[in-house]
């Protein structure tokens, strides 16, 4: 959401990790205000929310601003 300051704070970290894991992961952003049905379908109740999807299934979810190390750990677990 455009008004979400925590989302804006998290963006540079997510972009850094997208670069580090380029070719291994696909990173996308979704504005919940513009896509409320998608947010509802994934059970998103708070933002920012990071979903980690493997083989079409959500395998991990992080809600709130997280450190680069925390997010990287979940990416590595998801890739394992």
Regions found by a protein language model. Name each.
Residues 4-7, 50:
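The canonical Cys-X-X-Cys-His
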């Amino acid at each position: 959401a455009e008004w979400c300051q925590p989302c804006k704070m998290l963006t540079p970290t997510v972009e850094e990790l997208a670069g580090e894991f380029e070719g291994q992961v696909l990173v996308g952003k979704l504005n919940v205000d513009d896509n409320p049905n998608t947010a509802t379908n994934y059970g998103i109740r708070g933002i920012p929310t990071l979903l980690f999807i493997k083989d079409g299934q959500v395998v991990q979810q992080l809600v709130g601003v997280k450190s680069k190390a925390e997010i990287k750990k979940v990416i590595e677990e998801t890739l394992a």
